[in-house]
């Protein structure tokens, strides 16, 4: 067992010596009905945090190397699938036992080296896992960049999983989620819907190719593949809204916005939510009030979507890349970058806790919050 120091805060108070010890035991099974958070960090840890106590519950040791540490959960919340080993492999870890139950290499053919740039997820029924491979053929005198492919794996294939289907895919694909009807939604130059049986990609939300009058082309940097309580697939964009057809950049209004797909219905949304005053790496709507939008990087910010207005912003000890809500929407958990998870009250925007994890930085991990 490993002793972990966890420090909680009263709202509005400063960090103090209110620490206690939590024990992280690989053999601890998760409890039905309890809410947890999973995140990863160096050297190669998968952590489970109990959100009732905001304490580390257990730590699973992962094989091979860390990076990026992106986590996707099976629908029954029993298995965490992690893209790791420098973007080269996907591992499935049973959360109750820390046992590895799945492994797939992104590289599938002799002579190639392939990586997935955050592009993987689990199907809505948990039976399949999807990845986008970006292969390069390593020849004696040159490298050949090959066509990306969408690979489909059976999740019960064990530790040497091979694709059961493969299809050509567009370039520059990143995060993805599976809809309730089996449609795969993938972010790239546009947001696509994909038939995973035929490999057909169809533009669902134009991004690079949008035609919004008097708007500049949007800019999208979003690699945090979040499974949300709102059951949506969302990513942020920035754009400029011009005053007229002259499209003068000097008078344009810089804006932040949100692309979103409802995973239950497939309904899409392209919504500006506020002025662009700073950069956020990830953002999420409140589970209890869909009109409230939050974003994080160097500050934690809250917006009123209808009014397109910044309501509050909180100062952070350091940058955080990834944000998550608890199910009630009352607390926000900030992860990524260093080795601590910061906890904020969603209403007051005051820090109310901090969990320091064993090991090193979380870097560019994607954390997930769930109820078993």
Where do the language-model regions lie?
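Bacterial N-terminal signal peptides that target proteins for export
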Residues: 1-9
């Amino acid at each position: 067992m490993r002793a972990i120091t966890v420090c909680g805060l009263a709202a509005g108070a400063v960090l103090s010596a209110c620490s206690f010890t939590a024990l992280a035991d690989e053999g601890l099974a998760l409890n039905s009905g309890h809410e947890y958070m999973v995140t990863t960090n160096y050297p190669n840890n998968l952590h489970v945090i109990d959100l009732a106590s905001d304490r580390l519950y257990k730590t699973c040791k992962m094989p091979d190397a860390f990076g990026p540490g992106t986590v996707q959960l099976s629908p029954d919340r029993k298995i965490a699938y992690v893209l790791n080993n420098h973007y080269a492999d996907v591992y499935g870890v049973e959360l109750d036992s820390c046992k590895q139950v799945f492994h797939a290499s992104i590289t599938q053919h002799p002579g190639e080296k392939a990586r997935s740039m955050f592009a993987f997820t689990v199907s809505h029924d948990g039976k399949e896992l999807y990845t986008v491979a970006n292969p390069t053929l390593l020849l004696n005198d040159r490298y050949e960049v090959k066509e990306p492919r969408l690979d489909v794996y059976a999740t019960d294939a064990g530790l040497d999983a091979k694709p059961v289907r493969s299809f050509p895919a567009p370039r520059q694909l990143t995060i993805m989620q599976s809809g309730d009807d089996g449609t795969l939604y993938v972010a790239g130059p546009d947001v696509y819907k994909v038939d995973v049986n035929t490999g057909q990609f169809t533009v669902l939300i134009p991004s690079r190719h949008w035609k919004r009058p008097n708007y500049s082309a949007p800019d999208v940097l979003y690699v945090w593949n979040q499974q949300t309580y709102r059951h949506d697939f969302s990513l942020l964009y920035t754009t400029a809204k011009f005053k007229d057809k002259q499209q003068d950049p000097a008078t344009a209004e810089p804006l932040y916005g949100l692309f979103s797909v409802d995973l239950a219905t497939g309904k899409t949304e392209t919504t500006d939510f506020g002025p662009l005053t700073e950069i956020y790496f990830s953002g999420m709507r409140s589970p209890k009030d869909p009109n409230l939008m939050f974003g994080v990087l160097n500050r934690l910010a809250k917006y009123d979507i209808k009014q397109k207005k910044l309501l509050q912003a909180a100062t952070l000890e350091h940058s955080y890349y990834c944000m998550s809500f608890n199910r009630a929407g009352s607390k926000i958990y900030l992860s990524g970058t260093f080795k601590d998870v910061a906890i904020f009250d969603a209403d007051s925007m005051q820090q109310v806790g901090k969990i320091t994890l064993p090991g090193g930085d979380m870097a560019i991990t994607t954390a997930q919050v769930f109820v078993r």
